[in-house]
Amino acid sequence: MADSQENKQKEQNDVSEKNFMIEKIKERPVNKKKLLRRTLITASMAVIFGLVACFTFLVLEPVISNWLYPEEEPQVVVFPEDQDEMSPEQMLAENMQQENQNSQSSSVPGEVMEQEQIRELLSGIILDLDNYKQIYSALAQYVAEMNRSMVTVTGVSSGVDWFNNVNESKNQSSGVIIAQNGKQLLILTDYSPVKQVDDIIVTFNDGTQADASLKEKDETTGLAVIAVELDTLNEDFLKNDITIATLGSSNIKDIAGLPVVALGRPMGTNGSLGYGIITSSASESAASDTTYRILQTNIVGSQNAGGVLFNLQGQVIGIITNGKSATDMKNMVCAYGITELKRHIEKMSNGEKFAYLGLKGVDVTAEANSELRVPYGAYITEVEMDSPAMLAGIQQGDVITGFGERVIVSFDEYTNSLLSMKPGDSVELTIMRQSQQEYKEMKFDITLTVLK
């Protein structure tokens, strides 16, 4: 009994101890200020994270896209080099000569038709009015086809006058479509209308208009290449409504007498044209580091003429220029020969700048070599002020015989060697300089710059 009572007493003591240990835990009251602060901090961190993510995406997205889907580079534009060509008249004369030789080998001498007899037969051919109509009708069809390669280029500039009125000025020139590089349609035009303008607008022969940008310019000739993005033009339009002109050759023996058509603005207005022949190709125009052949025609035009000369095979053989005619022939249309321009047009079409040395010169003739002992090379007639050549010590009368590793025997070879260089390149020039009665070799290291 006593044990059971002790046990009960212990149980009661344990229960009282447990009751004593039970506590009521109250919830901590919400601190609204702390909660608001944490909410603001969390929201701010989320905004900052979003901004960082957006910035990172904007920066890396083009890099990743170009890495995954690399953009195709424009194709390099290359024009085929000229080969010795014969004019149609030369081909006809050669064929007649061949026929005469064949007839001489198969006929007795008395049956051979002499040239005088041929001229007499030709002089008996009389053209009537219908023949002239047919000739000019054929020329009109030819011009319509060639005009598919011609465009009008408009340079637009905006300005504000004294009264805060916006003025818009426009300058126009003609242009010819010369190539496309897979991304752009390339057009050769005058530089002055597109120099430092706000917008360039190209109007094609059918009236379609498109925006263009300056690809590159050539200060020495006053020419430029502008580009129209292909994705801004309709595919059917590209296939059916325009034609890329073919650059021919002006390096034709006896080119005088070759029939030509002047398109663009030979009369000083866009869309004008002229028919005629080349009367001379003997004159040249010297410019910085190059020389151009001038094609003179019998087409009476404007002193502000522009455009191109086509031969009757549909090829561009000259780029019309002004101010290059003789003083007594100022209104006769003349043009730069396309052969001398091809490398310049090629560099502009690829967006490459021209390296500048600052020399004008001529070839050393056989007479000068034999009589005066002048070595063959590029004879320097002028060194331009403050040019890299002048600063290096090149003088008038020097003869360039080496350009780097290349041997130079003419001024054309010097020009072509320079065209293969870029501004900033260095080159070693080998020259021969007269010292008393003999020429001595000298070498100059020159860094090329850009013509300004």
Model-derived regions, located:
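N-terminal targeting leaders that route proteins to membranes or the secretory/organellar pathways
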Residues: 1-150, 154-157, 162, 236, ...
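A conserved glycine-rich beta-strand in the N-terminal activation segment of trypsin-fold
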Residues: 131-141, 156-184, 209-211, 244-246, ...
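Active-site loop architecture of trypsin-fold serine endopeptidases
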Residues: 168-169, 197-198, 233-242, 263-276, ...
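Interdomain regulatory linker/hinge segments that flank or connect interaction modules
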Residues: 120-130, 259, 319-366, 449-452
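Short glycine/Trp-rich loop-beta-loop segment that forms part of the substrate-binding cleft
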Residues: 246-270
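Catalytic-histidine neighborhood of serine endopeptidases
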Residues: 63, 67-70, 182-224, 228-231
